[in-house]
Amino acid sequence: MTNLIYFCAVILPWVMCGGLIVYLIFTKKKIAGLRLIGLSFLGAIIAWFLASLYKYNFPSPRPFEIMTNLKPLFTTATGDAFPSSHATFFGALAMGVFWQKSPSTSLDKTRDKSLRARIFGLIFILGAILIALARVLANVHSPLDVVVGLLFGGLVSLLIFKLFSL
C-alpha cells in the first residue's frame, strides 16, 4: 500500500506532465495542442506562485509536525503545508486540460468535442485527486490543505481559461 501511495504522491505528477508532452507529440492539431499545454501550464504556474506567496507569508505546520506520532512516508519541507503546492498545481493543470477539452465549455469551434477529449480531461482531474489523496495518506498534508489547493488551482485555471477565451 505504501508503494501505491508513494507512486501517486511522487511519481504520478511526473507521469501527468509527461502525458501532456506525449499528447503534443501525437496530436494532429499541433497549434491546438500547444494552446492546451501552454494555457494549462500557465494556470498551474500562476496558481502555484500565488499559493507559494501565501505559504511564505502565512506558514502552517504539516500534520507530522503537530502530531508527533505521525511519520511522513517521505521527507518534505516543514512549515509550509497550507495550501498544498502539489494539489494547487495539479488541480490547476487538470482543470486547464478539462476546460479546454470539455465540449460544454468550449467556445472555440475547432476544439475536439469527442468523447475521447472529455475522457482526457476527466483522467487529469482523477490524477489530481489521486495526487492530493496520496499526500494526505503520506501524512504530509491535511485534507484541508489539499481540498483548498485543488479548489484554488481549479479557480485560477478557470480564470485563465475565461481570460484567454475572450
Which residues fall in each region the model found?
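Juxtamembrane/transmembrane-helix boundary motifs in multi-pass membrane proteins
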Residues: M1-T2, T27-R35, L39, D112, ...
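Membrane-embedded catalytic cores of phosphoryl/pyrophosphoryl-handling enzymes
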Residues: F74-L166
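Alpha-helical membrane-inserting segments
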Residues: I21, I46, L50, Y54, ...
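Interfacial segments of alpha-helical transmembrane regions
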Residues: V22-L50, F120
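Alpha-helical transmembrane spans of integral membrane proteins, capturing the lipid-embedded, hydrophobic core
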Residues: I11, V15, S40-F49, L150, ...
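N-terminal transmembrane-helix/juxtamembrane module of multi-pass inner/ER membrane proteins
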Residues: M1-G18, A51-G79
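Hydrophobic alpha-helical transmembrane segments
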Residues: M16-G19, Y23, I125
